[in-house]
């Protein structure tokens, strides 16, 4: 026996162990490492996809917020345009109503002027007739100052 304790069995066991390690490395560790690398890559891809999804979600949310703001702005613009158009239509209608009222008032004033002139003409005719009648009465009577004043007062009263 050898003082270190190395004998043939130990060498055979060592060679068998090295062969076993070499076989395990070649047939087990290589495929296992490939599976683990594939799994690591798959997990990394999944994490990257999740990050991209998160970014896309944030981008979609931002876009949705922008679209909502644009829609609100557009709605506010439409409402403002409708209100402005309503004011324009109301002012236009009021302007037309004023024009119509002015036209009616002008027509009524013209008619009043015509009727006033007719009434004046009728009154002139009546005054002329009264003056003629009064003159005839004066000429038919013998007039003194008192009678003359009485006749004039009566004619003025009739006017």
Curated annotation (Swiss-Prot):
CDD domains: ATP-synt_Fo_b (cd06503). Its main location: membrane. The keyword Calcium does not apply. The keyword Cell inner membrane applies. The chain crosses the membrane at residues 4-24. It comes from the Bacteria. InterPro entries: ATP_synth_B-like_membr_sf, ATP_synth_b/b'su_bac/chlpt, ATP_synth_F0_bsu_bac, ATP_synthase_B_chain. It is a single-pass membrane protein. GO terms for cellular component: plasma membrane; proton-transporting ATP synthase complex. One of its GO terms (molecular function) is proton-transporting ATPase activity, rotational mechanism. Keywords: ATP synthesis, Cell inner membrane, Cell membrane, CF(0), Hydrogen ion transport, Ion transport, Membrane, Transmembrane, Transmembrane helix, Transport. PANTHER family: ATP SYNTHASE SUBUNIT B (PTHR33445:SF1), ATP SYNTHASE SUBUNIT B', CHLOROPLASTIC (PTHR33445). F(1)F(0) ATP synthase produces ATP from ADP in the presence of a proton or sodium gradient. F-type ATPases consist of two structural domains, F(1) containing the extramembraneous catalytic core and F(0) containing the membrane proton channel, linked together by a central stalk and a peripheral stalk. During catalysis, ATP synthesis in the catalytic domain of F(1) is coupled via a rotary mechanism of the central stalk subunits to proton translocation. Belongs to the ATPase B chain family. F-type ATPases have 2 components, F(1) - the catalytic core - and F(0) - the membrane proton channel. F(1) has five subunits: alpha(3), beta(3), gamma(1), delta(1), epsilon(1). F(0) has three main subunits: a(1), b(2) and c(10-14). The alpha and beta chains form an alternating ring which encloses part of the gamma chain. F(1) is attached to F(0) by a central stalk formed by the gamma and epsilon chains, while a peripheral stalk is formed by the delta and b chains. This is ATP synthase subunit b. It comes from Acidithiobacillus ferrooxidans (strain ATCC 23270 / DSM 14882 / CIP 104768 / NCIMB 8455).
